[in-house]
A protein has these predicted regions:
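Histidine-/acidic-rich catalytic cores in large beta-rich domains
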Residues: 1-168
Length: 168
């Protein structure tokens, strides 16, 4: 409903849908569906996506359990799923902190791996189309924050032309 707000409580691994007008919680996520998440996006009227850092304190010292994920929740079916997880696993996407995902209207997926200074762009079929590393002249990688794809027709033409030129 217009005016409702998604709130993401990272350290609780919890997302809620809050209605300020009535001061009520409309929905809250189930436990253990994601861990230390970021970036809730409305994908369709009945679906949201959540960037799952999948961060846990594991006995072997690892912090990210496998790879980061994009978790989808469907309000109509009350089901959770992942989006292009095999692609994220293949590219070893694993930022401990922060991170963003953006599912574009054509189904493509943009991922900001914030802590590793990497931005990835996947086709809707999971093919890695391009990667950007935020590398400075000293060859160090620097964090990325709040990257996004501007999805407008004129931008799509520019991106497609760029991708075609890179393929040659």
């Amino acid at each position: 409903k217009k005016g409702d707000v998604f709130l993401s409580f990272r350290n609780l691994s919890l997302v809620i849908l809050y209605r300020p007008g009535t001061n009520e919680i409309i929905w809250k996520s189930k436990p253990n569906k994601f861990f230390n998440q970021h970036d809730v996006d409305i994908v369709e009227n009945n679906k949201i996506s959540i960037f799952d850092n999948n961060m846990k304190h594991l006995f072997d010292g690892r912090r990210v359990d496998g790879n980061n994920r994009v978790v989808m929740y469907d309000f109509e079916t009350d089901k959770y799923s992942t989006y292009l997880n095999k692609s994220m696993e293949r590219e070893d996407v694993r930022t401990k902190l922060s991170g963003r995902s953006q599912i574009l209207p054509n189904g493509d997926l943009a991922i900001e791996e914030s802590g590793n200074g990497r931005f990835l762009y996947f086709s809707s079929k999971g093919e890695l189309k391009w990667t950007y590393f935020n590398r400075a002249s000293d060859n160090e990688l620097y964090h990325l924050f709040w990257s996004r794809i501007l999805y407008r027709n004129e931008v799509i033409v520019i991106v497609n032309n760029f991708l075609e030129s890179m393929a040659k």
